[in-house]
Amino acid sequence: MSQSFRVLLVEDDDSLRCCLGEFLAAQGWEVGATAFATEALTMARQQRYDFSLLDFHLPGMTGLELFQQLVSLRPLPAILMSGLANAEEAAAAQHAGFFTFLRKPLDLARLRQSIQLLIQSHFGGPLIPLRLHQQHCLPPLPPKPPFPPTRPNR
């Protein structure tokens, strides 16, 4: 039986929040999900969470700002996700203390691996297998462009 965790999920895209919430709940974990940073802060004051998944671009504040306020309440390992972030924002996430930074569209295998490593790093014990119950809810990554055909040297 896997260990039970409480996860705070803050994602303003309704469909992605729903899919991620289903994936996390399929692990047997309790999920607190919201689209709003201010609501996430209220939830964190009322409930103790073990780790969080935060979107970078949220209404009212960034995921970085939210993370700083969350850890001022209590230490909380977090994964930051963004589809628009650049290298500077990824570096800022690392400097702020996020466990890792994931680019959207999310690769479910990478998300699973990141969560497994976060759990192992912060809570000890062996890597736990995560169920793939809802893997179909995340859109597939776009195909990589083919290499251009090589031309023979003339």
Give a label for each model feature:
Residues 65, 85-100:
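Alpha4 helix (beta4-alpha4-beta5 surface) of REC/receiver domains from two-component response regulators
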Residues 36, 62-65:
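Acidic catalytic/metal-coordinating carboxylates
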Residues 11:
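Conserved acidic carboxylate
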Residues 14-32:
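Two-component/phosphorelay signaling modules centered on CheY-like receiver
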Residues 33-51:
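Acidic, metal-coordinating helix/loop segments flanking the phosphotransfer/catalytic sites
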Residues 64-76:
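Short amphipathic alpha-helix used as the core "switch/output" element in two-component signaling
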Residues 88, 106-115:
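C-terminal output helix
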